[in-house]
A protein has these predicted regions:
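Rossmann-like NAD(P) dinucleotide-binding subdomain of oxidoreductase/dehydrogenase enzymes
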Residues: 122-265, 317, 392
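ALDH superfamily catalytic-core signature
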Residues: 229-372, 435
Length: 479
């Protein structure tokens, strides 16, 4: 890939304003590369290229042909897995082992949607005599994808992979904080045979390139993953052109632990659910609600686990890497400062290793106990490695606490009681409920999305293909 350029119409092109943005390594706070600063004219060129591809070779390709291209792309990603992981680790600060898992997930997304491309179909509907009625699913046309900095490869894979499988041409605006891996994948896509213009990448700031994409009249669908505040702006901009939007926003996801749960099985999952990616995960299990009878012993065990966590540079491959930037680091500090001021006890915290650069954006994982349900630590998304522990007396209180935020992305339930498992799964306000696990290993086959302030629409799995298509009804009268 070429530094400080966009990928438009199958070529590396300079930004219209010839300006760049520094790429900073979160592990030491130092710039190590540059990207192009895209603006509205760059988005205009990218949309035009996508329109040409949709009207030309990509739009004319059969579903089977699209699937074969995506399968080749999956193989290319797998062949370059270590390279992509190294790029992602340095760009985001995440430990190399996590970046490696993200690259493997990217390959799997392309593999899954390659196989699904020719399985998407409409229906024949029963109707009155003399008519044949059927539905067909057609691609929207040109789809816009605004990709966040926390999981660039994974979210690119689940969003763009599904859109391409459905026959759309794509314009992608990755986050300026972490977009190098996405640019490399665009290059691999061209090598895999994706026609020029079917995939276009414009880098830049959200308020410039992102806003231009969201309000562009040539976009037929927008997929956005990010904060609720920005998601609201994107939806408003898209509404100017009556463009449908898939929003995957924040979360304040609870894990409910009952006294009959297998605590040995739950413990490492409760920790990893908030520590993974430094807590910078929309579905992070940031609240643990514990039944009163086992609250003290479980909090004690959690504290022991947290005290053993180590934080360091991405290359050290420890439990946590740095946060993405100084702004995010300050946000986490502000939450912890408010908690301390309000007398919320910190039960434990991890350790930043001694050789971590002082200029890096480090934050040790923190466990806070007895967090009041109304406190901002229990209500707002921290987006950092901070776990809020709370207690409950019975199921009703557990559900009240779990549903007591504006969010509704993920919930976890830990209990051996089968009746309780299904009863609570139906009562919890969340797009995903995991029972005696959390995340189900991140399977690409599982539809993912939220309710409330966590957004709407679904990505991942076969369900995502419906969002990237428009349903058309055809009624034929005979005789």
């Amino acid at each position: 890939m070429e530094e400080a350029k966009h990928f438009i119409a199958g070529e590396w092109t300079l930004p219209a304003q010839l300006e760049t943005i520094a790429v900073v390594d979160p592990s030491d706070g130092q710039p190590f590369a540059t990207i192009a600063r895209g603006t509205a004219p760059d988005i205009e060129r990218a949309v035009a290229a996508a329109r040409d591809a949709f009207a030309g070779p990509w739009g004319a390709a059969s579903a089977a042909e699209r699937g074969r291209v995506l399968m080749r792309l999956s193989a290319r990603v797998a062949d370059h897995l270590e390279e992509l992981a190294a790029i992602e680790a340095r760009d985001t600060g995440k430990p190399l082992k996590q970046a490696r898992a993200d690259a493997a997930a990217l390959a799997r997304y392309f593999e899954f949607y390659a196989g699904a491309a020719d399985k998407l179909h409409g229906e024949t509907l029963p109707y009155q005599a003399g008519y044949t009625v059927l539905t067909v699913r057609e691609p929207h046309g040109v789809t816009g994808h605004i990709v966040p900095w926390n999981y660039p490869m994974q979210i690119f894979g689940r969003s763009v992979g599904a859109a391409l499988a459905a026959g759309n041409a794509c314009v992608v605006k990755p986050a300026e904080d972490a977009c190098l891996s996405v640019l490399r994948v665009a290059e691999l896509a061209a090598e895999a045979g994706l026609p020029a213009g079917a995939l276009n990448i414009v880098t830049g700031y959200g308020h410039e390139a992102g806003a231009a994409l969201a309000r562009h009249p040539g976009i037929d669908h927008i997929s956005f993953t990010g904060s609720p505040a920005t998601g609201k702006l994107v939806a408003q901009m898209a509404a100017e052109n009556h463009v449908p939007v898939t929003l995957e926003l924040g979360g304040k996801s609870p894990q409910l632990v009952f006294a009959d749960a297998d605590l040995d099985a739950a413990l490492p999952v409760l920790v990893s659910a908030i520590v993974q990616n430094g807590g910078q995960t929309c579905s992070a299990g940031s609240r643990v609600l514990i039944e009163r009878a086992v609250y003290e012993p479980l909090v004690e065990r959690l504290a022991t686990a947290f005290n053993g966590l180590r934080v360091g540079p991405s290359r050290a491959d420890l439990d946590c890497g740095p946060l993405i930037n100084a702004k995010q680091q300050q946000r986490v500090w502000d939450f912890l400062s408010d908690a301390q001021h309000d007398g919320i006890p910190m039960a434990a915290h991890g350790q930043v290793v001694a050789d971590a650069p002082e200029t890096g954006f480090y934050q040790a994982p923190a466990l806070l106990r007895d967090v009041p349900p109304s406190h901002r630590l229990a209500q707002e998304e921290v987006f950092g490695p901070v776990l809020a522990a709370m207690r409950f007396v019975d199921e009703d209180e557990a559900v009240s606490l779990a549903n007591g935020t504006p969010y509704g992305l993920v919930a976890g339930i830990w209990t051996r009681d089968g009746a309780r498992q299904m009863r609570l799964a139906r009562r919890l306000r969340a797009g995903q409920v995991f029972i005696n696990n959390y995340g189900a290993g991140g399977g690409v086959e599982l539809p993912f999305g939220g309710v409330g302030h966590s957004g709407h629409g679904r990505e991942k799995g076969f369900e995502a293909l419906y969002g990237f298509t428009a349903l058309k009804t055809i009624a034929i009268r005979h005789g």
